[in-house]
Amino acid sequence: MTDVTPANAARIGIGGPVGSGKTALIERLIPVLQARGVDLAVITNDLVTKEDAERLRRSGLIDPSRVEAVEAGACPHTVIREDPTLNIAAGDALEARFPGLQLLVFESGGDNLASTFSLDLVDWWIFVIDVAGGDDIPRKRGPGVLRCDLLVINKIDLAPHVGVDLEGMLAEAARVRGGKPVIATNARAGLGIDRVADAIGRAVLFTP
């Protein structure tokens, strides 16, 4: 029998502004994807700490050795877009450590609406915004909102408390994105997480 070298793990990015719920989304996605048999690992990016990585390692949701941290310095977008070599190296190290790895999740440091991922780093990426940031975020048409493969609007439970018209915000997001997918979530409560996992599966894991 001829030996077959396994394909490299699929690589996805999760970006968005500070406090939008990126880490909370990952914490909810990990058990859902693992329950579907997905072998995964996570690379976090913080400015000068490893705070998000340590949070995931302490969570009990994933083997701590499957979480790597990249310290991005003053510009979190640089290490996911202009020069992603640190993240690429971290991903390669995890693939070498876990040969059966199917999915690598790269969490960007908190950034602004201009944050995007290099396609040298990821195959597909999610941008997370939240209703507390205001329902005008989709109208501002930042590159993160427009170019991501999936836009997640998080913290939808807060909409009535911050005066946001959630249905209008979702409709505006769908309009400016030209029909590309938008999913509403409450990551802390687990609402919408299965839909995000489904989107990841269809896009990069080739599940129905």
Swiss-Prot record:
This is Urease accessory protein UreG 2. The keyword GTP-binding applies. GTP binds at G16, P17, V18, G19, S20, G21, K22, T23. The gene is ureG2. It is found in: Cytoplasm. Keywords: Chaperone, Cytoplasm, GTP-binding, Nickel insertion, Nucleotide-binding, Plasmid. One of its GO terms (molecular function) is GTPase activity. NCBIfam families: ureG. Homodimer. UreD, UreF and UreG form a complex that acts as a GTP-hydrolysis-dependent molecular chaperone, activating the urease apoprotein by helping to assemble the nickel containing metallocenter of UreC. The UreE protein probably delivers the nickel. HAMAP family: UreG.
